[in-house]
Amino acid sequence: MKLHGRGVHLFSQFVGSLVFLAVFQDQGRRMNIDLSTLAPTQVYHLMTQTVIPRPIAWVLTDSGEQNFNLAPFSYFTAVSSRPPLLMISVGKKPNGDIKDTTRNALETGKLVIHIAPSDLADKVTLSSATLEHGESELETTQLETVDFQGFELPRLEGAPIAFGCKLHEVIEMGETPQSLIFAEIEHIYVDERVISMEGDRLKVDALAVDPLARLGGNEYATLEKTFSVARPK
């Protein structure tokens, strides 16, 4: 039997699954997994179930003439405060083209990164669908934007935190490759209902923000509770 194209790909995944299960059965509950034995999709699924919880960057960019693109990314973190940088890892479309978020950021140099509340989980998920370039997720999600004071792009209404950013750098990484987007924060919007003052510092109430967090598969998480531990002096 000869396999071609997608058949070879599926067969390779099947063999990889058998190897993974064999390792699991051999070691029982004490898993020590050699990633070189896994298929790329298995590595992805394992990473997204173990690097948890992950914050979600809900990114708005301009496709041109106020036609806004919106997409969520959970390979996302803060990397520096001087300069104030955020990093988002963006993959490719199924056909191998760069995603609109990357394309728009490169062309306009601007993006707005939102922290989505848990009650917008359905909208976040819906905005992850692949659309044709120029189609807007704002239409499919029926979300509204409002003016982002002091920044060129608008922000999403209903998101308690928004970062107005300029593009700092894009680095291509890996075999796919992924686009690592480094965005420098120029303006921050915080809903006044989630902030208070502690001396000369602003304090953001994390439970009031109620940020949506990403787990593996289709699963999300919420904070539910916070606690403090004093740092050593």
Positions of PLM-derived features:
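Polar low-complexity intrinsically disordered regions enriched in Ser/Thr and small residues
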Residues: 8-10, 19, 202, 220
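Low-complexity, intrinsically disordered or signal/transmembrane-proximal segments
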Residues: 4, 9, 13, 25-27
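Basic, polyanion-binding surface patches
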Residues: 28-233
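Short, Lys/Arg-enriched N-terminal segments with co-localized hydrophobic residues
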Residues: 16-30
